[in-house]
Every structure is written in structure tokens, then in C-alpha cells.
Amino acid sequence: MAPLDLTRGQTDACSTENKDILCRNVLIYGHCRYEDQGCTYNHDQNKNSSQPEAPSKKMFNVDSPSFTPSGQSTVLPKKTTLSSQAASAAPFTPRGGGTPTLQTTAESTMFNPAAIREFTPQNYDLGNNNANGISQENGLYPDPFTMSTMGTALPTAGQYNLPLYGDHSGLAAPGAPFYPPHAAYPTGPIQPPHYHLYQPFGPYRQELQPWQRATYDFFMPQNLREDLQKKQFATLQVIPNSGLPQLEHWHSLVPLDTSNRKNTSCFGYPSWVYKAQNSRNGRHYALRRLEGYRLTNEKAILNVMKDWKKIKNASIVTIHEVFTTREFGDSSLIFAYDFHPLSKTLQEHHFQPIHGNRYRPPPAVPENTIWGYICQIANALKTIHSNRLAARCLEPSKIILTDINRIRLSACAILDVVQFGMNSRSVVELQQEDFVKFGKLILSLATGTLPAHLNNIPAALETLGNKYSANLKSAVNWLLDTSSGETKTIEHFMTGIASQMTTFFDLALQDNDEKLFHLAREVENGRIARSLMKLLTILERGDYDGVPSWSETGDRYQLKLFRDYVFHRVDADGKPNLSIGHMLTCMSKLEAGVDENILLTSRDNETVFVLSYRELRQMYDRAFNELVKASKTGAPGANT
């Protein structure tokens, strides 16, 4: 920038008046190149500072008070510092000795950040109809988040009066300390609840200190999630080109046996287990096949299924269908049961030897686990015996473990069909045999010996007494005792183990509370997906109601900017910001309609909006309701 030429147009009359005025070139550049060429202004800074400053009556002074209209009664005092209005004043150029006049420019006033009041959050006022300073909209779209409408629904002040999440200053007035003392709860007006946070409920608690947090305080427990995912994968598992046939409406057969050896000790026929899908309902079932069985009496299936379909018990695998087929190249009998993925038999879980440096037997089963098995099998036998039936198959290879210490009888009704009309024993005799098999099963679990290898039961009972309590030994001895000649009942047995039944029942209730706790936290995990679907039906929509740019105008344009704010963010280097937490937080706040302001900017940075989530929620509802009204039948779940 060239220095100002202050010598042009000067007169002698003006020279005398300008000699006491400090040259502006000296102030700006430190010197004046026209000092020796006739510049009439003062060039000595020391001289200017030593002389008293006389206010100029003719020249413009930056220290003069700002202009005040004549109608204003109060006169502002003169400021001693440089006024902010001087920044927008016209450049100083001396033109003569006359009285200068201020010239107005057509340029707009510069943006002054100091003139904007700083936003200070105030306390909520439930009695105020417009607590947020935003005009309420009447008509078809009432505001569900108005504090006046929530005041009647919320409890009175002092009840549940907890500070808002993330508000460390509680409910105090502006200027309160950032971390106030927590001696008592605040007594001001209550805050609205967090509808965008889904708080789990239930009495489930873990032994943690108040300042401690576990991972599943924020997510589903990792082991539970992995277990559910593995079971889902196992349910959907298929084997291409397996060579297994399709059985009428059963398809996609997958073998579940871990051994390919044929075993006829339990049913008298080799049996195999498959997973199959039912084409009628799409569900998966477990099919148990008896190889080489030839049905001689059709009433066997009808009568047995009529009796066993009535059995509904949590410790028994439900049977659904029995049929014969020749698709395997022979005459086979098929039983369809409920499918429990990743389940193992008690024989696979407890009787498999451990192979290491030396061959050693499996470890002993804890007594609490054995008592849990006893309570569940007793529960199953009570239901079976109450319906004048017998379990008949209490083998470790036919009882499955579906979860931790959770067992089910999986081969019921098979012997009733296979031996239909051939068995001369009564139901009471078969029920008494169930008690003996029950006792051998528990004794084999306690001693680590399969029931078929229990040749010396008294010696096994002595071994049991050395490792476990006297109550367990007494219960097993009662089940195995056949010398008394009395008719045993499952009710009598359950009376003797009432203490253990109560303990197991309490553990089951605690487990149910824990599952309910995690379920309550996941009950609304699909709400963000539904909100996103509704948002996408509004954005980028083509011609609507004769308006080609409907989605680019009005409220829809601001929703489009909100979409960019949530999903198209970049960091300081211009790289995509893929923070899932940011996306979930923004969509949750939009769903809740909170009063938090955000800055929305267009992609060309020409348009800027400062909007709250509550205003965006109103725009979001109006736009979607407009689409719903225009549709013929409406949108299913539009009001969810």
C-alpha cells in the first residue's frame, strides 16, 4: 500500500492549523517520505505527546462518543477507550481546513462477535408455557416435548429430583461451581426424563462398589452374546451336497452325531440324529432316526403321540411328529423333536476322558451340579408320572445339556412306540424302573462310571459317601433300593430333597432376573433403525405432489443437512469420521427431541442453521406425516 500523499490540495491557511496534528504516516509507517517536501503536519512524536491534547472541534475524533438519536433521553458517557464502531469508520484522509462531514457508505456493517449475547442455560420452568423461548406451533403438529404439558405428568418437585445426565452443575443458577458438593439432592424443579436412553430394570445386582463399572453395564455380556450368536450359526448351518435325502416337508438335513459307530443298546435299533428344517413353518427340528425299524401296528404311533403331545415341561424335549420313511434306503422310524443348538449329552460332557501326557479319568462333578440335575430330572418325572406315563430312557447319552447345568430328557416316547403291544409290564412297574435308572444315573455321575459298568453298586455307594455329602448318598440309596417292596412315588422323593429344590429354585429365579435385566436393555434396540427408515423416506425423494424439488425445500432441506451432520462428517484432515457412537447419539437425541442446539452447514458453506433436536424432530414429524397423508393406505408402524 502506497503512503498517503498529504501535500496535495493544502493551503496556507490550513498549514498553521495542521502543525500541531501528528502526521498519520508517522503513526502507520513510522516516518513520512513527504516531510521534506512540504508536509504541513507534525512529525515529532515526543513533541506531540508532551503537549496537552486539545480536543479538535473540526476534525473527526475516534474518541468521540457514539452517535445517539435525538429522541433518546439518556446520554451515554464518553468512552476513554477506542470504540468498536471506529473499526467500520471511513479511512482518514485530510481534505482541507473546513469542518469535515461524515459520509455514509453503502457497505454492510461488519460482523461484531462482541455484540452477541452469550447463551446461558437457565433452569427449567414447568409453569412457563414457553420455557425454551421458542414459539409453539399450533394446529396439526402439537409439540409433545413442551415442558408445560410434561408438568402435569411428572411427579412433584423433590421426588426423583436427580440432576440431568452430564450436567455437573446440577440445577443451580448460572455461575454455580462446576462440581458442587453432593451432600443432598437439589430442590429445584425436576428435569425431564431421558427418553433416548433405555434404562434396564429388575432386581439383578452384581457385587460391585459404587464407583466400579463392568463392561455389561453398557452392553450385553460378551459371553451371552457369543453364546447366542454361536447358537444362531449352528441353527442355520447347512452342508452342501451332503447326500442326505429330503423327507417330505423336511429338508436341509445335517447330521448331529459325534460318532459314526452304530449303538443298539438303548432302543434295540441303531439311531441317528439330524437337524432339519420344516418347509411348512420354516423352523428347525431335531430328527431321531431308528434305522431298520419296520412298523407293524399303525396304532402305535397314534396312541403314543396322543399321550405324549400333552406333556409340556421345561425339562423334557417336546415331541412333535412321528412318521416312517424309506428315503434312506431302508425302513426307518423318524421322531421330530425341538432343536436345541450346540447341546451336548451328559455322556459327552462328563464321561469323555482327558487326553494329555497321561490318560486320566474326567474330573469329579461338583455336588451342586449333581443336585441341579436331580431337581430337573425329578421335575420331569413328576410331569410324566402324573400323566400315567414312564420316561423309560434315563441314559447319559439321551439326556442333553442345553445350557450351563440345564438338562432335558431328549428320547421320551421312543420305547413306547418300539415296544408297543410287546411289553406286558404295567405303567406302575415302568415308573418304579424309572427310579432305579434315575439312581444309577446319579451314581454314575458321582463316580465317573457309565451305568452299564456299575457292576458293584454297594461299593460305588461307599465311594459316593467318601466324596459327597450324606444327603446325596441317602437320596441315591433311596432311588436304588428295591428290597422294601413299597411303591415309590416322585412326590415322596421330592419331599426328601425339598431343601435342595428350594436352593435350585432360587438360583433359577436369579438367572431369570439376570436374563430379564439384559432383555429390558435390548427391548428398544430397533427404534433407531425405524427412525432411520422414516428419515430416508423423506430425503432424496423425487417428484412429490407436483413439486420436483420437494425434498430440497422447506424443512426437508434442513433434515438433509442433519443427515450430512450425522453420517457424512470428516475430521480435520478431510478423512471420513466413522464414529458409530456419534451416529447413535445423534439419532437417539432426534428421537427424543432434546433441547440441545447443533450447527448445520451446507456443503458449500454458504448456508448455516443453528437448530435444536426438538425443532428437527418437529420438522421430521411434519414431513413424514405429509407423506403418510398422501399415501393411499398409510404406512404400517408410522406412529411408532
From Swiss-Prot:
GO BP terms, alphabetized: mRNA processing; nuclear-transcribed mRNA poly(A) tail shortening
Spans annotated as Pseudokinase domain: 237-498
Gene Ontology CC annotation, any one: P-body
InterPro entries reported in the protein's UniProt record: Kinase-like_dom_sf, PAN3, Pan3_PK, Prot_kinase_dom, Znf_CCCH
Compositional bias annotation for Polar residues: 43-53, 63-87
Gene3D superfamilies (UniProt xref): 1.10.287.3700, 1.20.5.5160, 6.10.250.3160, Transferase(Phosphotransferase) domain 1
Positions of transmembrane segments: none
Zinc finger feature spans (C3H1-type): 17-46
UniProt entry tagged with the keyword Coiled coil: yes
Pfam families: Pan3_PK (PF18101)
Family membership noted in the UniProt record: Belongs to the protein kinase superfamily. PAN3 family.
Protein role: Regulatory subunit of the poly(A)-nuclease (PAN) deadenylation complex, one of two cytoplasmic mRNA deadenylases involved in mRNA turnover. PAN specifically shortens poly(A) tails of RNA and the activity is stimulated by poly(A)-binding protein PAB1. PAN deadenylation is followed by rapid degradation of the shortened mRNA tails by the CCR4-NOT complex. Deadenylated mRNAs are then degraded by two alternative mechanisms, namely exosome-mediated 3'-5' exonucleolytic degradation, or deadenylation-dependent mRNA decaping and subsequent 5'-3' exonucleolytic degradation by XRN1.
UniProt note: domains: The N-terminal zinc finger binds to poly(A) RNA. Contains a pseudokinase domain. The protein kinase domain is predicted to be catalytically inactive because some of the residues important for catalytic activity are substituted and it lacks the equivalent of the binding site for a peptide substrate. However, it has retained an ATP-binding site and ATP-binding is required for mRNA degradation, stimulating the activity of the PAN2 nuclease in vitro.
Name of protein: PAN2-PAN3 deadenylation complex subunit PAN3
Origin species: Chaetomium thermophilum (strain DSM 1495 / CBS 144.50 / IMI 039719)
